[in-house]
Design a protein with these regions (language model features):
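Extracellular glycoside hydrolase catalytic/binding regions
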Residues: 1-16
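Aromatic-rich peripheral "rim/lid" segments of glycoside hydrolase catalytic domains that contact
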Residues: 21, 25-142
Length: 142
Protein backbone atom coordinates (compact mmCIF):
# COMPACT_ATOMS: atom_id res chain seq x y z
CA UNK A 1 0.00 0.00 0.00
CA UNK A 2 1.38 3.40 -0.98
CA UNK A 3 -0.19 4.92 2.11
CA UNK A 4 1.62 2.51 4.42
CA UNK A 5 4.97 3.07 2.66
CA UNK A 6 4.66 6.84 2.90
CA UNK A 7 3.59 6.82 6.55
CA UNK A 8 6.42 4.46 7.50
CA UNK A 9 8.91 6.71 5.73
CA UNK A 10 7.43 9.86 7.31
CA UNK A 11 7.59 8.48 10.84
CA UNK A 12 11.11 7.16 10.35
CA UNK A 13 12.19 10.65 9.29
CA UNK A 14 10.39 12.21 12.27
CA UNK A 15 12.14 9.86 14.70
CA UNK A 16 15.54 10.29 13.00
CA UNK A 17 15.26 14.04 13.55
CA UNK A 18 14.45 13.77 17.25
CA UNK A 19 16.83 15.58 19.60
CA UNK A 20 20.05 13.67 20.23
CA UNK A 21 20.00 11.50 17.12
CA UNK A 22 22.44 13.47 15.01
CA UNK A 23 20.31 14.83 12.20
CA UNK A 24 18.43 18.15 12.42
CA UNK A 25 17.40 17.33 16.03
CA UNK A 26 14.45 19.68 15.64
CA UNK A 27 11.49 17.31 15.66
CA UNK A 28 9.37 16.64 18.74
CA UNK A 29 6.57 14.67 17.12
CA UNK A 30 4.13 14.33 14.30
CA UNK A 31 0.51 13.71 13.43
CA UNK A 32 -1.08 11.14 11.14
CA UNK A 33 -3.94 12.43 8.99
CA UNK A 34 -6.54 10.87 9.12
CA UNK A 35 -8.29 8.14 11.16
CA UNK A 36 -11.02 7.06 8.75
CA UNK A 37 -11.89 7.87 5.17
CA UNK A 38 -13.67 11.19 4.65
CA UNK A 39 -16.59 10.33 2.42
CA UNK A 40 -17.79 13.93 2.51
CA UNK A 41 -14.66 15.28 0.80
CA UNK A 42 -15.96 14.95 -2.77
CA UNK A 43 -19.05 17.06 -3.21
CA UNK A 44 -19.11 18.19 0.44
CA UNK A 45 -22.87 17.66 0.88
CA UNK A 46 -23.65 14.98 -1.71
CA UNK A 47 -22.96 11.24 -1.77
CA UNK A 48 -22.22 11.22 1.95
CA UNK A 49 -22.82 7.48 2.11
CA UNK A 50 -20.77 6.73 -1.02
CA UNK A 51 -17.02 6.30 -1.39
CA UNK A 52 -16.26 8.43 -4.44
CA UNK A 53 -13.21 7.66 -6.53
CA UNK A 54 -12.85 11.13 -8.06
CA UNK A 55 -9.46 12.75 -7.56
CA UNK A 56 -9.95 16.45 -6.89
CA UNK A 57 -6.39 17.82 -6.88
CA UNK A 58 -2.88 16.96 -8.00
CA UNK A 59 0.36 16.31 -6.10
CA UNK A 60 3.60 15.32 -7.79
CA UNK A 61 5.01 14.08 -4.49
CA UNK A 62 3.21 10.77 -4.98
CA UNK A 63 5.12 9.35 -7.92
CA UNK A 64 3.21 6.06 -7.94
CA UNK A 65 0.16 7.60 -9.56
CA UNK A 66 1.16 11.10 -10.64
CA UNK A 67 0.55 12.11 -14.26
CA UNK A 68 1.26 15.75 -15.10
CA UNK A 69 -1.97 17.63 -15.78
CA UNK A 70 -4.20 15.02 -14.09
CA UNK A 71 -5.58 14.91 -10.57
CA UNK A 72 -4.31 12.06 -8.42
CA UNK A 73 -5.37 13.00 -4.89
CA UNK A 74 -8.66 11.90 -3.36
CA UNK A 75 -8.96 12.70 0.33
CA UNK A 76 -11.90 10.34 0.64
CA UNK A 77 -9.28 7.56 0.76
CA UNK A 78 -6.79 9.09 3.24
CA UNK A 79 -7.93 7.18 6.33
CA UNK A 80 -5.77 4.56 8.05
CA UNK A 81 -9.11 2.78 8.38
CA UNK A 82 -11.58 2.33 5.54
CA UNK A 83 -15.30 2.69 6.04
CA UNK A 84 -17.69 -0.15 5.43
CA UNK A 85 -21.02 0.65 3.74
CA UNK A 86 -23.36 2.88 5.74
CA UNK A 87 -25.35 1.05 8.44
CA UNK A 88 -29.12 1.44 8.66
CA UNK A 89 -28.64 3.94 11.51
CA UNK A 90 -26.35 6.02 9.18
CA UNK A 91 -23.16 5.10 11.06
CA UNK A 92 -20.10 3.26 9.77
CA UNK A 93 -17.93 0.40 10.87
CA UNK A 94 -14.27 0.65 9.89
CA UNK A 95 -11.58 -1.75 8.64
CA UNK A 96 -7.95 -1.12 9.59
CA UNK A 97 -5.71 -0.75 6.55
CA UNK A 98 -2.06 -1.85 6.31
CA UNK A 99 -1.03 1.66 7.40
CA UNK A 100 -2.92 1.16 10.68
CA UNK A 101 -0.90 -1.96 11.49
CA UNK A 102 2.40 -0.34 10.49
CA UNK A 103 1.64 2.63 12.74
CA UNK A 104 1.02 0.24 15.63
CA UNK A 105 4.58 -1.00 15.20
CA UNK A 106 6.07 2.46 14.62
CA UNK A 107 4.57 3.79 17.84
CA UNK A 108 6.12 0.97 19.86
CA UNK A 109 9.51 2.51 19.04
CA UNK A 110 10.78 5.03 21.57
CA UNK A 111 13.12 7.52 19.88
CA UNK A 112 14.20 8.75 23.33
CA UNK A 113 15.15 5.33 24.66
CA UNK A 114 18.33 5.30 26.74
CA UNK A 115 21.38 4.61 24.54
CA UNK A 116 19.35 5.27 21.38
CA UNK A 117 21.55 5.65 18.32
CA UNK A 118 20.70 6.29 14.68
CA UNK A 119 21.85 2.75 13.95
CA UNK A 120 19.63 0.96 16.48
CA UNK A 121 16.72 3.21 15.51
CA UNK A 122 17.17 2.11 11.88
CA UNK A 123 17.38 -1.51 13.06
CA UNK A 124 14.01 -1.19 14.78
CA UNK A 125 12.41 0.33 11.69
CA UNK A 126 13.85 -2.45 9.51
CA UNK A 127 11.95 -5.00 11.63
CA UNK A 128 8.61 -3.49 10.57
CA UNK A 129 7.31 -5.61 7.70
CA UNK A 130 4.92 -4.14 5.13
CA UNK A 131 3.86 -7.59 3.92
CA UNK A 132 2.69 -8.58 7.41
CA UNK A 133 0.64 -5.39 7.69
CA UNK A 134 -0.89 -6.03 4.26
CA UNK A 135 -1.87 -9.57 5.28
CA UNK A 136 -3.53 -8.35 8.49
CA UNK A 137 -5.47 -5.74 6.52
CA UNK A 138 -6.65 -8.36 4.01
CA UNK A 139 -8.12 -10.42 6.84
CA UNK A 140 -10.41 -7.48 7.69
CA UNK A 141 -12.01 -7.62 4.26
CA UNK A 142 -13.48 -11.07 4.75
Amino acid sequence: SSQAKYLLSNWKEIYQNAPGLGKAENCIGGFTFQWSDGWWKTGQTTNLDKHDSTASWSNGGYRYDFVKGQNNMNEEWFGVTSKRPTNTDRTYSVNPRAAFYLLQEVHKINPYKKNRTPENLNDEFSKIKLNEALEKAKLNLR
